[in-house]
Amino acid sequence: MRLKNILLAIIFCFSINSYGQQFDLVILGGNPGGIMAAIEAARMGKTSLILERNSHIGGLPANGLGATDIATRGATTGLFSEFTRRVKDYYIRKYGIDSQQVKDCSDGFHFEPSVAEMIFKEMLGEQKNKITVLTQRQFNFSDGDLQMKGTKIIGIRVVNRTTGGYEYYSGKIFIDATYEGDLGAAAHVPYRIGREARWEFNEPGAGRTYEYWKSEPAEGSTGDADNAVQAYNYRLCLTSEPSLRANIKKPENYHREEFVSLIEDVLTGRNTWKYMRDVTSEMMEANRKAILNGGKSTLPGDSWGIQKLVTINTLPNGKTDANNQHGAFISTDLPEENWPWPTSSWEWRDKFAKRLKDY
């Protein structure tokens, strides 16, 4: 009987500890939203665990999106305002207040990816007694990866991508800071993917729409609902500084036919801007002759040089945040190929990520 009681006690201990150390907050995703949630919680005396799938934290700002997308900087407050201030202070300390780097950081809204990651780590490090960050932890959003009590998440299982083993964590509150919404989906939170129909909420710009960039909907636009999601790309940190350059190798699976149409795009000047509605075939042929004679494109809306392919935003130290060129037929996006991403496995996502990188 005594042995039986001991065994029961051991089993009971395993069951209550099966989801490991408990935190006030368990945050899935080391993106800016997750990082800032942990920092604010720490300043309120709460403990947090951040589980990040990749080896780097910081999400988009630490991976190429160095030119902050914000139309009204006056609306910047809170922890993001603190982040931009720290960015600017870093460039002032390192290069001097009158340096080109400080000018190019645009009051802290433009930054090199490595600087963004450094600032995030600095802010997290100030709360190291309250915040635990674990990288290379993958949540597979499958049955058994969440422990639920009714509709409340109380535990999570992740894969340690370094060891291949499972790890279990519990928390009072769980935050989904992934770009995909994987935690919410796994917890059966209702969601929808794609564009709603024009008439569902009486939105004239909703649904399936075709148009030139910055134009009005063109013929063929139905306004119907579909499963389309915004195209994805890599924000390219390029440079004009020879000493900072890294060679870009030709991918093994490079397919020339995917880019052949770019030759005609360059010669004729054709693009996706609204001005193309008024461009004639005669104008494009005249543009072709001018370029073949050593001139530059004069077609309305056309870009020249590398900006034919990407939109260049200046960052400090001669670097760039190169985004998709919305005015081009071929750029860094792969529209429609990415549509399965939100609900696909990590195996599919990794394959698409490589496909996009190679492209």
Annotate each language-model stretch with its function.
Residues 46-47, 52-146, 192, 201, ...:
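Conserved N-terminal/central alpha/beta ligand/cofactor-binding core
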Residues 5-15:
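Sec-dependent N-terminal signal peptides
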Residues 34:
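N-terminal Rossmann-fold NAD(P) dinucleotide-binding loop
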Residues 16-20:
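Sec/Tat signal peptide C-region and signal peptidase I cleavage site
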Residues 41:
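Aromatic pocket-lining residues of Rossmann-like dinucleotide-binding sites
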Residues 21-31:
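Beta1/beta-strand and adjacent pyrophosphate-binding region of the FAD-binding site
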Residues 136-139, 144-155, 162-173, 177-359:
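Flavin (FAD/FMN)-binding glycine-rich loop and adjacent Rossmann-like elements that form
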